[in-house]
Amino acid sequence: MRLWSLMQSCRWVAILPMLLLSSAYAQSEQILYDLRCENLVDPLSIDTHTPRLSWETAYSDKGNHQSAYQILAATEPTLLKEGDADLWNSEKTTSSESVLVGYKGKLTPDNRLVYWCVRVWDQNGKPSAWSKPARFGVGISQKEWSEDDYIGFPANAGNPQSPLLRTTINVTEVGKTTLLYVNSLGYHEIYINGQKVGNEVLATAVSEMDKRSLYRTYDVTSYLTAGSNDLVIWLGQGWFRPTIRWGFYDGPLVKVRLATYSDGKWENISIHNDSWQTAESGYSSLGKWTPNRFGGERINAAAVPQSMQKKDLDLLTWYPAATVQAPELNVSAQMTEGNIIVDTLKPTNVIEIADSVWVVDMGKAYTGWFEYKLPKLSPGQMVTMRYADHFHHGTTIREQMQFDTFVASGNEGDRFINKFNYH
């Protein structure tokens, strides 16, 4: 039994670890590190036409400081050389600025990614070595997103609250940089050939979807193989549901775009809406997702696929995905770090307070997921979990209307874990 602690981009401020650079001092007196665009490390999509760049410099001698910088930008990292940089060469610029320095190079939708590096001069005019390359993505324009329709689970085919959507991507040559853009109304997770893409959870971040929705960009180059590739998007309602004013459909929806870099140019890979299939996942929502009624998740273990591998997905019942006409929505790149699991906690105490009723004390208040393995139960047997941050009277927890239910499959190895809600 364990608890996943989540870092919420909308609630917590990340404390970044100090970077230890002392071992590098013997080789150079000026070490450039922590290159960022719009305060993000290598963002694959930004939501601005005027990006700003930042870097930090470690000096071996106290009192040294930057007196000038030079930035190179190019369409490929191999072009980050003076005379070759095809997007920008700032030349030597006299300035001590190293935070949110304006990018003044070429920036067009035809160049999905911009690679850049920087070097600096100290107060004595001594230059540093060039930094390691960084990159940022230009992203998808509002006009491009408006050309696509949302897809989701058909309204009358079953439970639409947490569906799987599946299609095939054909790849003729591996190794080409390939970016996947996902604009979901609700949460999403991405799987390619059975493997989860990235370590982010509860994506995208929270937004008021009647004003704007967010999209995430994934570098899926390393996940693709030559031939046919299985792409699965697992959706959850999150903040997009009928109990909230902008929930115009009873189920999450998604738009997807794919682009690949080949022979010096970016090409869009078409994924037609009619190629998508959808199935129930075994997960569904509980509660109203309103203050003091955020509920949780219901997991029907018998309906959850054993894995995201093709052999297990093929056992599900698939329907053609529904195309959904939606109100015109502003679509923006998510300009915050994603939610990730940052710690795993184990209970400090487990108390049986009645027949088949236990209190699990995690030892601290938390924001996160709950996970545990169950013994073999009878098919359809239900386990209910309720969550609170303190006891009310003795061993009675304070009711906060946060709860999950698990319906056993009757097989060995049943496991509960949250996916599209948290407590």
Can you annotate each of these PLM segments?
Residues 24-28:
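Boundary at the C-terminal end of the N-terminal hydrophobic targeting segment
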Residues 1-8:
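N-terminal secretory signal peptides that target proteins for export/translocation
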Residues 30-113, 117-423:
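Extracellular/oxidizing-compartment recognition motifs
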Residues 11-22:
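Bacterial N-terminal signal peptides
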